């Protein structure tokens, strides 16, 4: 730390202030500086945080998991879009070359549109909780991939923008902080 001796002719140095206009133009406000850095370096792996994890491929988020949000499997199987047996069979057949979702699409068991809709819903719901303020630092494991596979990669800026949009919406509807961390029902 550098100490600056202030005299009547020398004002103290200005403190850095975040430029909110520039943050808005970027599309993200720094919800997770670590995630922003990983996106900039186009990292592949998994970011594990207190409330879940985000899977990245080449700096884009391809999957998110949180115990507070329904996963892709539940969204696809809950209302008959896909049979639970078909999901389980594809998950068992998954290997390094064949992702679960690719097996379902190639087998004609799932349409690309239904998969993308459910995937984005599950990803954004889980990311909302994963990116919530945390009392512990996140950890990133390079090179880890998810067996579901990448359906539609989401840029980090879009993910953070959606997380902030959801926080703002929830705060406007119900300004009690207790609802911010409650699991989705």
Where are these regions (language model features)?
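Acidic, Ser/Thr/Pro-enriched low-complexity segments and adjacent helix/loop capping patches
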Residues: 1-185
């Amino acid at each position: 730390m550098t100490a600056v001796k202030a005299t009547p002719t020398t004002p103290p140095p200005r403190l850095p202030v975040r430029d909110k206009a520039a943050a808005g133009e970027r599309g993200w406000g720094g919800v997770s500086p670590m995630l922003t850095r990983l996106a900039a370096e186009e990292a592949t792996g998994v970011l594990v945080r207190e409330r879940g994890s985000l899977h990245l491929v080449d700096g884009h988020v391809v999957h998110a998991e949180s115990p507070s949000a329904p996963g892709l499997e539940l969204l696809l199987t809950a209302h008959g879009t896909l049979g639970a047996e078909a999901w389980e069979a594809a998950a068992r057949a998954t290997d390094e070359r064949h992702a679960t979702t690719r097996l379902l699409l190639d087998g004609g068991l799932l349409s690309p549109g239904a998969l993308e809709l459910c995937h984005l819903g599950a990803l954004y719901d889980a990311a909302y909780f994963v990116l919530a303020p945390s009392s512990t630092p996140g950890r990133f494991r390079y090179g880890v991939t998810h067996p579901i596979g990448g359906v539609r990669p989401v840029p980090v800026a879009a993910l953070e923008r959606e997380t902030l949009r959801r926080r703002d919406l929830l705060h406007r509807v119900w300004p009690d902080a207790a609802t911010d961390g409650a699991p989705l029902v």
